[in-house]
């Protein structure tokens, strides 16, 4: 049905503002919609596969049909009155029907698969003798390229292992082959993984192979770069590298740089120390030490000073961080060549997993250790190199043969994870990259189900459509663990998190995803709202001080003034003496404006904080604090989208408080939950697989990110190529079905489909 009664008026979806579908959806859940025929309660359906429609949720098999009448669109109630501001339509009075409507619903489309499925299944090699025969008898089979990779053990070997190509099987089987067939002593092998979890998984896999016992496995020097090289440091100087001296926690390192920042006059609540530590880590991993750093911005100049002091404090107190484990070993080998020679003679073979994610210090260590034998097996996929912010560089994989002459290369190009439709979509996306080894993955089967692109109106409707689709699939027999919702940055998950918390669906997310409402900029604006509701909210006062260009030390002055003047903390701001007449005058005006926010609609209240209270100026002067991915102005736009459904700041604050509490609760529950929908950044999803994958925000500005687009305009292609690799990683997580969301609007502005999808022609949706 396209018609329903809403607030005693008959409405028609075809004459309804497109942006109001989400409000109708929410109001339908509140019982505010009724059937235009029988007057029973109805709801609005918003899903991926079918057009929006009103339906009876309390009774099945309804026979009601739309009446042959047109709703009135010229009554005072049905007329929209809006203020247009910065891409957001701010309602003077909230209504639904308009004479001129925003663009209508856009039907989901199936991606046209550029190459047809060619059923040439990878041939399983039949072995007649030796250890490969034993593996085959144990149910461990290989295609031709996999078998070549397993038995090629001498000299440098580069294994390009595409997504879903059986990389772990090849790496573990190669290790077992060397131990059993070639009788290589396990302690002559170094097996390097990028996570402790991956190392444990490989050991577990090895125990299932014939001829391998636990003693052999435990004799292999295996683990992450950090764990292996830290053991070397401990062996040679246990006192210097004692675990008691390790800065294990982020807060310990942050404490040191914050102390250094105070000496430079940096505000604890204003300066992004977490990003500063990330930048310091990047410099260290690329072997750029204090005094050698070339700062590329004013922010980096500050961080370079923090870096200098951070290293001095550590040196003075005999402390070290995780990055120092690799740098320390690198320096040890440089300063003591006899020790380097000892370890060169200690190891004959090196197997390095996820080689595309290697950084400079890791690469240099492997080159140093393998100088004698050159028996380095590097396994990776340049198309999945996505950690440039940590110092990782696919160039080390691409140029491997230059440093290791005589390199053999094996390409594992059979994808055993995903159907042809998903594999071919991934091929079409990644083929546009220039900096890569030319290769094309092949699927082993087809499901004749094309990946879908769907077009929600905005982020709110995007979340609703996805949750509706998941609910439908679970009702049809799917399990929650069959679903993953992926996103480029944490902020993009806000709406879908809120929609899932309102559902009965179990879900879990990365532990480091903070609540959107706890983000620095968002919390700053909301603190003005909180202060208008409670003028003695000390926490809110502390959070608005940076935006008023006041140091945290002013808080004590406010407490004193509040007592002396017998006034609220808010009023005390008008008594603060800063020594600047202009600033003091501004603080006096602030009290009246903040108090007026209690009766101001949320969208207008945000604008008043931005413009009348100087928050916009604060963001401009603050810059993006070294964070190339998340700008303060973007947070404000996201907050405006989130605030749109609320009629008062009281409602918005209550919602924000609830969502912050739910964020903590979901993370706590998630630690013990297995059968749950996964919310994850694309970065965190790497190496994992799911039956159904939904990708949020496949639009320019999201993926590729604005930062990459800006870099491209300035002549730097690398960030854009990494963004394309990110999309490739997201697509190849799907084992069965893939849904790409292309919102028509993002952050209150018209959005354009991701340029990475431009090659993929579309065709009408085939239901599935």
Tell where the protein language model's regions lie, with residue ranges.
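Conserved helicase core region in the C-terminal RecA-like lobe
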Residues: 24, 224-229, 354, 379, ...
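Accessory/regulatory regions of helicases
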Residues: 85, 89-124, 134-136, 702-768
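P-loop NTPase Walker
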Residues: 101-239, 341, 424-427, 732
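A basic/glycine-biased coupling hinge at the interface between accessory DNA-binding modules
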Residues: 128-129, 178-329, 374
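Conserved helicase NTPase motor core
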Residues: 131-151, 155-160, 190, 298-399, ...
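Helicase P-loop NTPase motor core
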Residues: 168-171, 406-408, 414-506, 533
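ATPase/helicase motor core of nucleic-acid motors
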Residues: 447-448, 478-602
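Accessory C-terminal helicase-associated subdomains
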Residues: 575-684, 705, 764-767
